[in-house]
Amino acid sequence: LVRRQWDIVGREARLRGMHMCHSPEADLVRDPRFGRMSEAFGEDTYLTTQMVKNAIIGVQGNYEGLGKGTHIGAVAKHFAGYGQVLGGSNFAAIEISERTLIDEVYPPFEAAVKEAKTLGIMASHGDLNGIASHGNQALLTGVLRDQWGYEGYVVSDSNDIARLFYFMNVAESPEAAAQMGLEAGIDIDLYAEDSYSYLPEMVKKNPELEKLIDRSVRRVL
């Protein structure tokens, strides 16, 4: 039923000219104070995994629909742990043990990558166990690509590359935030006004950045 529902969503969205959607939400939500619970599928790992997997297969037309131009790309979000922010507060820190991440939090995303072939993954707001998610190379490259073999693109959440500088204070400048996000594995910056917009000038001073930019462009194309 979920697959059929999202198949209709994918077809109708494509008819309206869309090519991708920032859905489904693969987070586990376990705090009733969290204001975005209605976007997720619940607190259970198995249920969320099945719902997310079938939602992606449906909206993408089991991936074949993208090539036929009948469906749109999915973006599973928010990688990782966003549904369990401290106090249920948006942008709050996330503290989850490694065992819980592997056994409970990661499986919906792993299924999205390996079984449903999601076109996109969105990084999480805030930080995970003290490391800013949008600068977390071990997570966005080590787990997602090296362990799971993900070949799609990673998109930032809204303005979160810029927030590495002006909100989280882990980058010394907007330019440094842009480089941090790019090196971590963020291919698309949503939005780029205060971060990736600096890349054309940055690459003139540091030609090595061109390799990272080319890598991200290939993933998107």
Residue ranges and their predicted role:
Residues L1-L221:
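Glycoside hydrolase catalytic-domain context in secreted enzymes
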